[in-house]
């Protein structure tokens, strides 16, 4: 049999002309069951862990997305992000080939978004130029730089006793209604003018509470540099679980470009509960307190992303666009304890991951000592290196004074006659405790904080009644702002006190004390 070359070319031409190129065939599957926001899907063979899955659109035509979490032999377990009432057995599910992403960038500042980065504040769409994946590997050891710059919270008790540095993870832990959120909000308000972008992640809170926080930030002028990510109690467990990672990615955008960012997770106890719910519905085996086995990894992979990265990392990331700058992401995770039990599963996990903790106690809060910080067991493991010279030199003995005062106060209840040294220690402790009280939404600059600590150390307050100390402090601050503005500006700029500044502050405090009645 002979082949004619002309026939072969004709055959090839006809084949090419008759070819119909359709759309790319995407991996598709079928919904087997839908229960409590968990969907079992059959037929997805090429799906990735954490991949976004596309479900049928809802009644308004909005596409629904889910997250593939369980990859089993003959089915895939996925959680629906958002409403799932319109999804039924037999629906078609498509792979997107993308890991879950959220919008990032400066366009998000001043806005309130949900866990997927969609605006929920009624101010119109967000014109974000970029998106980024929510799950990322934390910077390695070589990419990091040690914490050496302060992150001022504006709270006397924290900045003097448990200082926080840029790139640190400092846990705020305490029972309900002890002022945990108030401490974090004050820290955000104090970042005004400090070139710090703040991200506030509200997990499992009442919508009214989130609204109050946003209102407080707006009144303080802090919303212009803050992004609020809200997954309220009315939203699905999947959204509450995802929200923290979304917020972290938004904060990392600034860290990786040589800027500083602060992120508050309020609170991680509720995130762990949401993750437990999702895991149990996916039929993963429960462990201690019914949490899944990877609940430690849930928080460690999140909090390890808060770091201070070195100049080379920033330069490599921006491909040379930003040179000679380090970036940082500081985390203030919040954990709620039950009746002060810090030995529960989630609190111990987060304490072991973070670089220190601020303990807030109900008894102190009820006694009117606010912020209700327990000085004895609150620590900052790396913040000491970041503390400003001014505060470091002036606050040396305060922590010891307070710890000894609490110990002695317990004994003094039983002793009728006390020796002179003990009495003096008790009086000093009472004065220091009174002076560390601070009203909410009124963080102090370091110059005024330094003036207060200076007055304590030099004994100017020893003969003033304890109940008049806060009015003395308020008056002193007003006097210094009025008559010694240059001195305050110098202290603020230098962040240290030389001999001349000390002499001027000494004279100013003495002069004010004479006029104080």
UniProtKB/Swiss-Prot annotation:
<dbReference type="GO" id="GO:0045259">
    <property type="term" value="C:proton-transporting ATP synthase complex"/>
</dbReference>
<comment type="subunit">
    <text>F-type ATPases have 2 components, CF(1) - the catalytic core - and CF(0) - the membrane proton channel. CF(1) has five subunits: alpha(3), beta(3), gamma(1), delta(1), epsilon(1). CF(0) has three main subunits: a(1), b(2) and c(9-12). The alpha and beta chains form an alternating ring which encloses part of the gamma chain. CF(1) is attached to CF(0) by a central stalk formed by the gamma and epsilon chains, while a peripheral stalk is formed by the delta and b chains.</text>
</comment>
<keyword id="KW-0406">Ion transport</keyword>
<dbReference type="GO" id="GO:0005886">
    <property type="term" value="C:plasma membrane"/>
</dbReference>
<dbReference type="Pfam" id="PF00306">
    <property type="entry name" value="ATP-synt_ab_C"/>
</dbReference>
<feature type="binding site">
    <location>
        <begin position="174"/>
        <end position="181"/>
    </location>
    <ligand>
        <name>ATP</name>
    </ligand>
</feature>
<dbReference type="InterPro" id="IPR033732">
    <property type="entry name" value="ATP_synth_F1_a_nt-bd_dom"/>
</dbReference>
<dbReference type="InterPro" id="IPR027417">
    <property type="entry name" value="P-loop_NTPase"/>
</dbReference>
<dbReference type="Pfam" id="PF00006">
    <property type="entry name" value="ATP-synt_ab"/>
</dbReference>
<protein>
    <recommendedName>
        <fullName>ATP synthase subunit alpha 1</fullName>
        <ecNumber>7.1.2.2</ecNumber>
    </recommendedName>
</protein>
<dbReference type="InterPro" id="IPR023366">
    <property type="entry name" value="ATP_synth_asu-like_sf"/>
</dbReference>
<dbReference type="InterPro" id="IPR000194">
    <property type="entry name" value="ATPase_F1/V1/A1_a/bsu_nucl-bd"/>
</dbReference>
<dbReference type="InterPro" id="IPR005294">
    <property type="entry name" value="ATP_synth_F1_asu"/>
</dbReference>
<keyword id="KW-0472">Membrane</keyword>
<keyword id="KW-0547">Nucleotide-binding</keyword>
<dbReference type="InterPro" id="IPR038376">
    <property type="entry name" value="ATP_synth_asu_C_sf"/>
</dbReference>
<dbReference type="InterPro" id="IPR036121">
    <property type="entry name" value="ATPase_F1/V1/A1_a/bsu_N_sf"/>
</dbReference>
<comment type="similarity">
    <text>Belongs to the ATPase alpha/beta chains family.</text>
</comment>
<dbReference type="GO" id="GO:0043531">
    <property type="term" value="F:ADP binding"/>
</dbReference>
<keyword id="KW-0139">CF(1)</keyword>
<dbReference type="InterPro" id="IPR020003">
    <property type="entry name" value="ATPase_a/bsu_AS"/>
</dbReference>
<dbReference type="GO" id="GO:0046933">
    <property type="term" value="F:proton-transporting ATP synthase activity, rotational mechanism"/>
</dbReference>
<dbReference type="InterPro" id="IPR000793">
    <property type="entry name" value="ATP_synth_asu_C"/>
</dbReference>
<dbReference type="InterPro" id="IPR004100">
    <property type="entry name" value="ATPase_F1/V1/A1_a/bsu_N"/>
</dbReference>
<keyword id="KW-0067">ATP-binding</keyword>
<dbReference type="Pfam" id="PF02874">
    <property type="entry name" value="ATP-synt_ab_N"/>
</dbReference>
<dbReference type="GO" id="GO:0005524">
    <property type="term" value="F:ATP binding"/>
</dbReference>
<keyword id="KW-0997">Cell inner membrane</keyword>
<keyword id="KW-0066">ATP synthesis</keyword>
<feature type="site" description="Required for activity">
    <location>
        <position position="378"/>
    </location>
</feature>
<comment type="function">
    <text>Produces ATP from ADP in the presence of a proton gradient across the membrane. The alpha chain is a regulatory subunit.</text>
</comment>
<keyword id="KW-1003">Cell membrane</keyword>
<keyword id="KW-0813">Transport</keyword>
<keyword id="KW-0375">Hydrogen ion transport</keyword>
<keyword id="KW-1278">Translocase</keyword>
